[in-house]
């Protein structure tokens, strides 16, 4: 569960290391975001020669949460931390590589690119 002020790791090669959620998109009173949800983030820590700079604001999709996601068969997929992938205005990934596993829940038409770039799909 990601809410405003939550810090997330970045699971792509854009140069951002850490981001902070500044808004959960999808409704005026929406408080939490889970895996597959789009959020607005600001870059808090970035690599010196990366594509993004500290303070930049981007959309991002949540790809891993410590809270996890419940499957229809009753199983629960959890991760050690929270991670997101930065998106451009067309909701396409900015980076060309994805680090770490992602879940099958991202397998919608919007995020097939992220699933295909990921080294492991759980």
Swiss-Prot record:
SMART domains: Ribosomal_L14
Keyword line: Ribonucleoprotein, Ribosomal protein, RNA-binding, rRNA-binding
Keyword S-adenosyl-L-methionine: no
GO biological process: translation
Gene Ontology molecular function: any one: large ribosomal subunit rRNA binding
CDD domains hit by this protein: Ribosomal_uL14 (cd00337)
GO CC term, one of those recorded: cytosolic large ribosomal subunit
Function: Binds to 23S rRNA. Forms part of two intersubunit bridges in the 70S ribosome.
Assembly with partners or alone: Part of the 50S ribosomal subunit. Forms a cluster with proteins L3 and L19. In the 70S ribosome, L14 and L19 interact and together make contacts with the 16S rRNA in bridges B5 and B8.
Cited NCBIfam families: rplN_bact (TIGR01067)
Similarity field: Belongs to the universal ribosomal protein uL14 family.
Listed name of the protein: Large ribosomal subunit protein uL14
Natural source organism: Aromatoleum aromaticum (strain DSM 19018 / LMG 30748 / EbN1) (Azoarcus sp. (strain EbN1))
